[in-house]
Amino acid sequence: SCAVGGNIIPMAYGLPESRFLGIDFSPGQIRAGQNAIDCLGLKNVNLMQADILSLRKNIGEFDYIIAHGVYSWTPEPVRERLMEICKENLAPDGISYISFNAYPGWHMQGTMRDMMMYHTRHIEKPRDRLEKAQDLIGFMAKSVNVNDKYGVFLNAYTNLLNVYNQFDIQRRRNKQEDEFGLLHDDLEEVNDAFYFHEVVE
């Protein structure tokens, strides 16, 4: 999903002879991205609001297909369709970039996700869930020896949360509260990790 086009719009600006197509399920994200395109006067990039399951081969042939933040956070039918699109729409010498949560590294963060999901299981409001999850991470970071391997991970994770938090505060100051969530990745209902061979095979 292209979200607001934060990746492809700068590329379209810097590569005026190339053409770009961004696709996202969220109408709000597409509108925000289109506003940026209009302000820049770009003619070589288009954004499309669509469900990936409804996309057909006639969207065109691409030298690059980038799917960041999709594979691990969507159900199996969407993942399968994404792979089909790469097969159908990628140029013969094209490259597809698909990000996903990868094992074995994800095992440690997956443990934290399980704890956060359990800790926030009775909380419905997204903002309250995020704050409760942050509290848990902070508590865990303080409870584990910083020299322990798990302690090193927790402290690094806490630092990452602080960066996310500052970014989120700035967005709210700018009244940009759309579907973006502070811990969107880790608290998403679907969040699956895979070994590399499971994706490429």
Name these PLM-found stretches.
Residues 95-152:
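Conserved class I S-adenosyl-L-methionine
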Residues 4-17:
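Conserved SAM-binding loop of SAM-dependent methyltransferases across substrates and taxa
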Residues 56-65:
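A short acidic, Gly/Pro-enriched loop at the edge of an enzyme's catalytic core
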Residues 19-24:
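Conserved SAM-binding motif I beta-strand of class I
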Residues 41-52:
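Conserved SAM-binding strand-loop segment of SAM-dependent methyltransferases
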Residues 80-92:
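A short glycine-rich, Lys/Arg-flanked "PGG" loop and its adjoining helix->strand segment in the class I
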Residues 26-28:
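Conserved SAM/SAH-binding beta-strand->alpha-helix loop
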Residues 148-201:
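Rossmann-like AdoMet/SAM-dependent catalytic core
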